UniProtKB/Swiss-Prot annotation:
This is Metallothionein-1. The gene is Mt1. It comes from Mus musculus (Mouse). GO terms for biological process: cellular response to chromate; cellular response to zinc ion; detoxification of copper ion; intracellular monoatomic cation homeostasis; intracellular zinc ion homeostasis; negative regulation of growth; negative regulation of neuron apoptotic process; nitric oxide mediated signal transduction. A divalent metal cation 6 binds at residues 37, 41, 44, 60. A divalent metal cation 5 binds at residues 34, 36-37, 50. Residues 1-29 are annotated as: Beta. Belongs to the metallothionein superfamily. Type 1 family.
Length: 61
């Protein structure tokens, strides 16, 4: 998949472990596709890479 991961809202991303997602709005994260990582997010604990502020997170909620 494109490393920029421009998936649609509500979709799922399947980026590599060294994902450089910049526009990911997916509801189902796989590996490093979270847009951000709020404290206590179990999915982020599994390897998501923070890309933005926690208060804007929609991927790991």
């Amino acid at each position: 998949m494109d490393p920029n991961c421009s998936c649609s809202t509500g979709g799922s991303c399947t980026c590599t472990s060294s994902c450089a997602c910049k526009n990911c709005k997916c509801t189902s994260c796989k590996k490093s596709c979270c847009s951000c990582c709020p404290v206590g997010c179990s999915k982020c604990a599994q390897g998501c890479v923070c890309k933005g502020a926690a208060d804007k997170c929609t991927c790991c909620a």
